[in-house]
Each structure stands twice: as structure tokens, then as C-alpha cells.
Regions:
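Conserved N-terminal beta1-alpha1 strand-loop-helix module at the mouth
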Residues: 2-51
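Active-site pocket-lining/capping segments in soluble small-molecule metabolic enzymes
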Residues: 3-7, 126-152, 202-254, 259, ...
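Active-site-adjacent beta->alpha loops and helix N-cap segments on the catalytic face
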Residues: 2-8, 29-32, 57-69, 88-94, ...
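Conserved, mostly hydrophobic/aromatic
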Residues: 21, 49, 99, 172, ...
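Active-site beta-loop-alpha junctions enriched in small/polar residues
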Residues: 22-25, 52-56, 81-87, 110-113, ...
Length: 305
């Protein structure tokens, strides 16, 4: 596709709903940054916020602590990530029940990456759930939860073809998934074609675009190569030469993400899930540009008038 089309419709923010992803902090410093981010983004009133679960279930306790704190100290609705990699069924069921007892009603159900990370060979646990579809079924067996699942506009790196990829999404839906959230992408045509494939396969749940504001273009480009996400040439050109200019890099990044969202709105999309990387600056700026404003901002604007 060419570059995104930028909408100038004044009511655009009324048509957009957002959610945010956080990851559990590993240190006191990272925890402080996370809660600064939560505090900054909470007034935007996201539909929910998700908290990730590390590769191989490595962040189980930290994920639980973060979710509990969001429940107890904010007005936000948390969605706990659940994975089934490297875990027996009874271990996964125990974690599900732990979150349910805590008051969690939303989950993001993922097969998960091996402990070795993205690209490592996946081997189902001999006594575990084999994939994300089975995990969705397990969640529904515990309670009538709101369950988000993953979707891949450029197909999962392990899928041999799109038919296999779409079939797995269909199995998740048949087992009770509420919505799908996509891996990040930078070519909206690819997302649109993926949604068309899903609809032809009889999948009618919302397929929510995952939006990744680019805090570090080099890192994003490298990670994209590992997980099979295309970085368009025009986008690389926009960030070219900005490695040592973080201020301009941030301005470009917020504009690129806002343009992507507004182009998708013009195509009929209304829900967006932002991968925050536990940083508020770009996400807050993008939300402001697409018309999602905090009550504090509106009050300040009224006072200035």
C-alpha cells in the first residue's frame, strides 16, 4: 500500500475505542515507570488494559501482582494474559482460578512463546493444552469470561499458509473467543485482506488491530524481521537518520501511528489495542491526535477558552 490517508473529520474520536497492553515490571525502577504510565493513560478511559505473561510462564507472580494492583488501585479493567506453553493442564487451571478468585473477568488467551523466546521450536507439554484454542476452552470451562485471542495479518511464523492460520483462529472462536487482537503491523492493506479471509471462513468476532508506536525504529525493525511483520520502505525512510535524534524520532513515531489508526478508521475500524511498552508518551500523543482526550485535558481547554 501507499502511505496512510490522514482523516480530518472533527468527530473522529467519538468513533474510536482503545485498549492498552502493559508488561509486568522486573525492577523497582521499571515498576515506577509502569505506574507513571498507568496514571497518565487511565484518564483516557480505555475499554480494558492487558497485562502480559512472560515466555514460558516466566512472569506468573509478577503478572498476578500487577493485575491485582490495577484492580485495587485504579478504575481500569484488567485482562490477564494466559499462556499454556511449558505447563501441565492442572498448573494452567490453577492460574486461571487464581485470577478468577481475584475478580478478573477478562483474559487474553495465547499459546505463548517457548522460554527460549521468539523463533525457538514449540513443543507442547505432554500433559498440557496443545494450543490457544484448547486454552480458550479451558477458560470457558471455568467461567463465562471475556476472552481475547491472537491473530496474525501476515500469518503466524510457524503457520505453513494462511489457510492453516485462519483455521486455528476459527477453532479459538468455536471454543468461545470474544475478539481477536492482531500482532502489530504497518501495512493496513494486509490487515484488511486478513479480515476478509477471516470473514469468508465464517469468523465474525471483532478483529482488533494491534498498534505499536515506534519508540526505537532499529529495535522494531529487527523484531519485525524475527516475527514476520513487514516494515514498508516508506516507513523506513521516515525514520532514516533519526537514531541520534530522539525528539524528532518521537514526533515522527506519533504521527505515523496516528496516521495508521485514522486510515483504519476510514476503512470502518473502531477498536484499537496499543502495545505501550510501558511508556505513556507516544500512546498519549497518538490518542490525543485521534480525538481520545482525558477529562483533565478537556477541563484545561475549557478554562483556557
Amino acid at each position: 500500500m501507499n502511505q496512510f490517508r490522514f482523516s480530518r473529520r472533527p468527530d473522529i474520536g467519538d468513533k474510536i475505542r482503545v485498549s492498552f497492553e502493559f508488561f509486568p515490571p522486573k525492577s523497582d525502577e521499571m515498576e515506577a515507570r509502569l505506574w507513571d504510565t498507568v496514571t497518565r493513560l487511565q484518564p483516557l478511559k480505555p475499554k480494558f488494559v492487558s497485562v502480559t505473561y512472560g515466555a514460558g510462564g516466566s512472569t506468573r507472580e509478577r503478572t498476578a501482582r500487577t493485575v491485582k494492583r490495577i484492580l485495587n488501585e485504579t478504575t481500569l479493567t484488567p485482562a490477564a494474559h494466559m499462556t499454556c506453553v511449558d505447563a501441565a493442564r492442572h498448573e494452567v487451571d490453577e492460574v486461571i482460578q487464581e485470577f478468577a478468585d481475584m475478580g478478573v473477568t477478562r483474559f487474553v488467551a495465547l499459546r505463548g512463546d517457548p522460554a527460549e523466546g521468539v523463533g525457538a521450536a514449540y513443543r507442547p507439554h505432554p500433559d498440557g493444552y496443545a494450543n490457544g484454542a484448547e486454552l480458550v476452552g479451558a477458560l470457558k470451562g471455568v467461567g463465562d469470561f471475556d476472552i481475547s485471542v491472537s491473530a496474525y495479518p501476515e500469518k503466524h511464523p510457524e503457520s505453513p499458509d494462511f489457510a492453516t492460520d485462519i483455521d486455528m483462529l476459527k477453532r479459538k472462536v468455536d471454543n468461545g473467543a470474544t475478539r481477536a487482537i492482531t500482532q502489530f503491523f504497518f501495512d493496513n492493506d494486509l490487515y484488511e485482506r486478513y479480515v476478509e479471509r477471516a470473514r469468508r471462513a465464517g469468523i465474525y468476532i471483532p478483529i482488533v488491530p494491534g498498534i505499536l508506536p515506534v519508540h526505537n525504529f532499529t529495535q522494531v525493525a529487527n523484531f519485525s524481521a524475527r516475527c514476520g511483520a513487514l516494515v514498508p520502505a516508506w516507513m523506513a525512510e521516515r525514520f532514516d537518520g533519526l537514531q541520534a535524534d530522539p525528539q524528532t524520532h518521537a514526533l515522527v513515531a506519533s504521527a505515523v501511528a496516528a496516521e495508521q489508526v485514522l486510515d483504519l478508521v476510514e476503512r470502518g475500524v473502531g477498536d484499537f489495542h496499543f502495545y505501550t511498552m510501558n511508556r505513556a508518551d507516544l500512546v498519549f500523543a497518538v490518542c490525543h491526535m485521534i480525538g481520545i482526550r482525558s477529562h483533565e485535558s478537556e477541563a484545561a481547554g475549557s478554562a483556557a477558552a
